[in-house]
Amino acid sequence: MIELRHISKSFKKHNVLEDISINIKNNCCTALIGKNGAGKSTLIDIIVGNNHYDSGQIADKSNLLNKHKMGILFQKTEFPKYIKVCELLHLYQSFYQTFISFHQFKEITQFSDRQMDQFACNLSGGQQRILDFALALVGKPELLILDEPTSGMDVEMRQHFWNVIEKLKMNNTTILYTSHYIEEVERMADQVMMLDKGKIQLDDAPENIKRNQSYSVIRIPCKYQE
């Protein structure tokens, strides 16, 4: 389990994160939700070590934040010019002692042989996104961190993406992801955390959130003319 205790972060005297305390449980799929500017990406950057925090502490009892155990998909996907998809795969495979096969990589991306031989920067936005996701899986990570993973994907590709996530969950991969799509949160999350104005406003299982949620009914009077 990864424990964050009283994490705070500010930029130019503006509090982006304020006293964040959460647990990212092993073998659990956790959704981090919130509107744009809520601090989700900043929190992700702090967890993976790309950003320093002003105060607080992070305890990684399972050593999941080891770079060889962690796969990361950042919010923005960019590839260098003139490097082919197959070359990217071989490059990423060289970083690990154990890694997914060429066949497994093609299953995740659903790329044809022609696309595997194509320059990555020439793929469509959705194809680049699924490629970036597949590269995050090359080293068979125990922890997967995904920042807005399905942005730029069409409906069919998003469906395939979540089918892959379901298989990873069955293999007990620990997953933390951010999303704006409520159906993805309802379908995949074991735990939901809502970040708003730099603070955790909600941290619970989806079924408990549904059970405790209150609904309002608004009656609007209408007059009909005969």
Each language-model region and where it sits:
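Conserved ABC transporter NBD signature motif
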Residues: G49-H68
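Conserved ABC ATPase signature
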Residues: F119-L123
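Catalytic Walker B motif of ABC-type/P-loop ATPase nucleotide-binding domains
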Residues: L144-E148
